[in-house]
């Protein structure tokens, strides 16, 4: 690792929050009380919080200034029109419906675009996305390239859709039985892996032949654009904004969690070009979120989201963002800690199968590892394996994903390289006595999205 490859933070810190580390004995009590679920730990008991990059970003001085310009009118807020103008300029879609966060957009899209029994092919599932699709009668079909399921394979653009898999599904079920293609840019559960522009264009060409719509999960689209600029031929001289605009020219719409690449703590939106879908979405947003001009958000939050979206396109910001994550991954890899490769956009994913080879998947190695990391060094991470995958809606059996990982997720503009050093040191220390990590079993298992609130105990 060459330290000159990693630039200093491209910002000055104007406001700080004091953090503390409680001692190891206290952390052991905290994790037991939380049922070995890191989601159930109080934030005050966490030293470095790498649970998620969703809503945990630091906002800029301009965004904080925008909060003071909130137009809190119930209808027709000027902040909505600023957000609408910004989204249309950057993404190029005709219509936008704001929502309180990404899953609000997923809920609306699933209701208006899926008929019971239709398939929704996509490049790997995401927890809330698949839940809304299945809740509305859809059948998710994974059509990501096979390489994405191999944690050890270091190849670019592991998020690409396998066009042969998509064509095979069309041939088997008929285009009329496919609601839309759900294309995530980047692919969270594959390790934050990007999708190439070549693949997006090819997916668009194939679906257009069959009259199938394509909706992107745009949550980390700016991170995806950086990888295209860095790794795909013909894009080195393009701006991030130009790349993002081209990406979405191959889509019919998108869902967006603004809590990631819009650099805010709350907010999201749904975009589309189709007028009928837009009218249907506006009818539903009134029921679940609020007026179509605020979608469950305060005006000030829409203003901050509009400003943050523009800030995320700055090359210096997104370069530092990607390289900070890569820095942590390289430190762990150099120490022999097994990680998912290549390092993606928003997190380093620990390969729990290789980290805890003594724990079978049915005894939740990733969940156990996340709990052990907290006890070891006060760092909160997240399970992304069999627990997150949930159960088959028909058989009730556990989904058994090939990737059993712990996501070490870096919030934007929050932590420094020194924080990454501390995280790496803690995980490396734990890896040296990994055989002490104990398998887990359910004490309480919720029926939906169980990873959020499930409780576990040491397996007897």
Swiss-Prot record:
EC numbers on record: 4.1.99.2
GO MF terms, alphabetically ordered: lyase activity; tyrosine phenol-lyase activity
Residue numbers of N6-(pyridoxal phosphate)lysine PTMs: 260
UniProt keyword Repeat, yes or no: no
Origin superkingdom: Bacteria
Keywords linked to the UniProt accession: Lyase, Pyridoxal phosphate
Reaction(s) this enzyme catalyzes, per UniProt: L-tyrosine + H2O = phenol + pyruvate + NH4(+)
UniProt cross-references to PROSITE patterns, sorted A to Z: BETA_ELIM_LYASE
GO biological process annotation, one example: tyrosine metabolic process
Gene3D superfamilies (alphabetical): Aspartate Aminotransferase, domain 1, Type I PLP-dependent aspartate aminotransferase-like (Major domain)
Cofactor(s) required, per the database record: pyridoxal 5'-phosphate
UniProt-listed HAMAP family: Tyr_phenol_lyase (MF_00543)
NCBIfam families: PRK13238.1 (NF009709), tyr_phenol_ly (TIGR02618)
Family affiliation: Belongs to the beta-eliminating lyase family.
Subunit structure: Homotetramer.
Protein's name according to its UniProt entry: Tyrosine phenol-lyase
Gene from which this protein is expressed: tpl
């Amino acid at each position: 690792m060459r330290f000159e490859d990693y630039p200093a933070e491209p910002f000055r810190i104007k406001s700080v929050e004091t953090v503390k580390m409680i001692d190891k004995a206290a952390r052991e009590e905290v994790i037991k009380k939380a049922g070995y679920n890191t989601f159930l730990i109080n934030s005050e008991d966490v030293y470095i919080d790498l649970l998620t990059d969703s809503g945990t970003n630091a906002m800029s001085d301009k965004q904080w200034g925008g909060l003071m310009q909130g137009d809190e009118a119930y209808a027709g807020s000027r902040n909505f029109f600023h957000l609408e103008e910004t989204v249309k300029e950057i993404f190029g879609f005709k219509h936008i419906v704001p929502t309180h966060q990404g899953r609000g957009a997923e809920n609306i899209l699933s209701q208006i675009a899926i008929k019971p029994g239709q398939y929704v092919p996509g490049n790997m599932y995401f927890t809330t996305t698949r839940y809304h699709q299945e809740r509305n009668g859809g059948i998710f079909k994974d059509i990501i390239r096979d390489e994405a399921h191999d944690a050890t394979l270091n190849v670019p653009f592991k998020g690409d859709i396998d066009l042969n898999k998509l064509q095979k599904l069309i041939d088997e079920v008929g285009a009329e039985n496919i609601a839309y293609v759900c294309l995530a840019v980047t692919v969270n559960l594959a390790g934050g892996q990007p999708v190439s522009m070549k693949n997006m264009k090819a997916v668009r060409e194939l679906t257009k032949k069959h009259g199938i719509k394509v909706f992107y999960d745009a949550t980390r689209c700016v991170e995806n654009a950086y990888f295209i600029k860095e790794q795909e031929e013909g894009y080195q001289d393009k701006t991030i904004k130009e790349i993002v605009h081209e990406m979405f020219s191959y889509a019919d719409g998108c869902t967006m969690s603004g809590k990631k690449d819009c650099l805010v703590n709350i907010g999201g939106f749904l975009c589309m070009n189709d007028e009928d879908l837009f009218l249907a979405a506006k009818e539903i947003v009134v029921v679940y979120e609020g007026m179509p001009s605020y979608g469950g958000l305060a005006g000030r939050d829409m203003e901050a989201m509009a400003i943050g979206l523009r800030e995320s396109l700055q090359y210096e910001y997104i370069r530092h963002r990607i390289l900070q994550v890569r820095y942590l991954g390289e430190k762990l890899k150099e120490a022999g800690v097994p990680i998912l490769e290549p390092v993606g956009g928003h997190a380093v994913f620990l390969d729990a199968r290789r980290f805890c080879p003594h724990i079978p998947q049915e005894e939740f190695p990733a969940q156990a590892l996340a709990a052990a990391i907290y006890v070891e060094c006060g760092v909160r991470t997240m399970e992304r394996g069999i627990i997150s995958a949930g159960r088959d809606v028909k058989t009730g059996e556990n989904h058994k994903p090939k990737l059993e990982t712990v996501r070490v997720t870096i919030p934007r503009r929050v932590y420094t390289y020194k924080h990454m050093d501390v995280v790496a040191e803690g995980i490396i220390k734990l890896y040296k006595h990994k055989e002490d990590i104990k398998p887990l079993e359910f004490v309480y298992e919720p029926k939906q999205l169980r990873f959020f609130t499930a409780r576990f105990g040491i397996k007897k």
